[in-house]
Every structure is written in C-alpha cells, then in structure tokens.
Amino acid sequence: MKISTFNAKTKKKKFVNAEEINAFKVAYGKPLNRKDYLRYAIIPGLVTGVFSFLLLYIWWLSLIFGLMGSVYGLKVLMPKVIKRAYERDSFRERNKFVNNMTSLLANDSQTLLTSLQRASDRSQGELRADLKILLASVMGADQEQVLQAFKQMSNKYRDDITFDQYLEQLETCVLEGRTNLETLKDIKTHHNEMKEKKDDYERKKEGHLKDMKMLCGVIVVFVLAITFSFGFKTYITAFARHPIGWITSGIYMTLMCFFFKSFTTYLFDDSIMEVKA
C-alpha cells in the first residue's frame, strides 16, 4: 500500500489496520514483526494492569484494565509511534537529498540529470524509489510530461513546504535548461534550519517523556507508601474494599487517563510550522 493512500485513509477513520501501519514501517525500515506487536501490547497492558491492582487489589478488574491497555497500545500507540518515526526518517532523507543535490549542482561539470541520478543513488528508502521514478519520467520527456512528473512528486511531499519549493526550482531548471544555484542554496539553508528546529523540538520532547516516566515511578512509590504506612490489611478493608476507595480510585484513574491522552497528543504532534486553532 502506498503512503499517500495510507494518509488519505487515516484522515477518515480513527484506527488503522496492520497493512496500513506496515506501509509506514517498510518505507524506511523493516516490516512489522511479532516483537513489535508484543512490545506495544505488553508494556501498556502491564502499566495499566499493575497500577489499577496497586490501587484496589482486585485481580479481575486489573485484568480488564490490562486488556484495555494492550488494545490501546496496539490500536493507538503503535500507529502513532510508527508514523512519527516514518515522518522523521522521511524528512531527514529529504534534507540529505537537498544538501547532496545542491552540492552536486555546484560542480559545473555535472548536468542536472546527472546530479539527480547521483543524488538519488545516495538516498534511501521510499524517497530513493520516488526519485528514481522522477528521473526516469523526465529523461527525454517533453514539457507536459516533465510538469506531470514533478507534480506527482510535489503532491506526495506537499506538507514539506520548503522541499516543495526545492522541487519547483528543479522543475524550472529542467524546463529552462539552466540552474539557479543561488536560489537552490537559499532553499537548502532554510531546509537545514527547519531540520535543526525539528531536532531541537524532538530533544525537548524526549526530555518530557523521561519526566513522564519518572512521574509514573513516583506515583507507584507514593501509592505503595500509603499502602504500607496504614498497614496492608487496613488499606484493603478501609480503602480497596470500600466504596470510598472505589470512587476515589475511579476519579484518579480517569484523571490519569485524561492527562496521559493530553501528553500523547503533545508528544506525537511534530508540526512546528503550524499554529493550532
């Protein structure tokens, strides 16, 4: 399945299937395997199951929460993580291509098509395949065919505005038979700046993710401290087996779910050029 098809489908429905997730995974990596499924099922399942058990010590309720956590991990977290990794790798490959292509064009002995051939050879994954198709489409093509070939490439990567501008300049170079190197260098500089911003943004999010993991550990320690400070039997009878404990735990779990949902929304929002309404 093509990535463009995947993107169109994911905008229309909440969950995606394994084939669609795999389309992202194989674009710049290996296909989904058993370890991927186990990882995204076991970790969220254990976190929700163990945490609910520490609050109420009801095994069957913890089992239900554990199953819910596993489903959430497979249906929500796994697609988001894989899609985010795809977008990161795709952008880095585009940035590498822009830098390689500009460097090659700076050499007067290199023609545009020769530079495109060499730059595509240095690329990897999905972008490499797209560049090979573009190169094959423009070689010996008339003006209309060149326009159509670049239009298809541009439509696929239109979310990367700077890269789209770079493609427009390459299209002009092919049609006019001359290279506007200074303009290409300016676009390359801007794309490099975007990469630096994205990398810095990702580092900040990784730091917040570490803080989130630490917070979860602190919460577990806090719950255990309360449990053993009152005595295990007292905690069970006065809280875990009491309606007050059920209501309090229900409210607490609900608040934690909302907090986690807000955090994951922030974590997987990598757009730094758009302002949300």
UniProtKB/Swiss-Prot annotation:
Membrane topology, from the record: Multi-pass membrane protein
Subcellular location: Cell membrane
Coiled-coil ranges (or none): none
Keyword Transmembrane: yes
Transmembrane segments: 37-59, 63-82, 214-236, 246-268
Keyword Ligase: no
Keywords: Cell membrane, Membrane, Plasmid, Transmembrane, Transmembrane helix
Any one GO CC term of the record: plasma membrane
Chief place of localization: membrane
Protein name from the UniProt record: Uncharacterized protein pXO2-23/BXB0022/GBAA_pXO2_0022
Species of the source: Bacillus anthracis
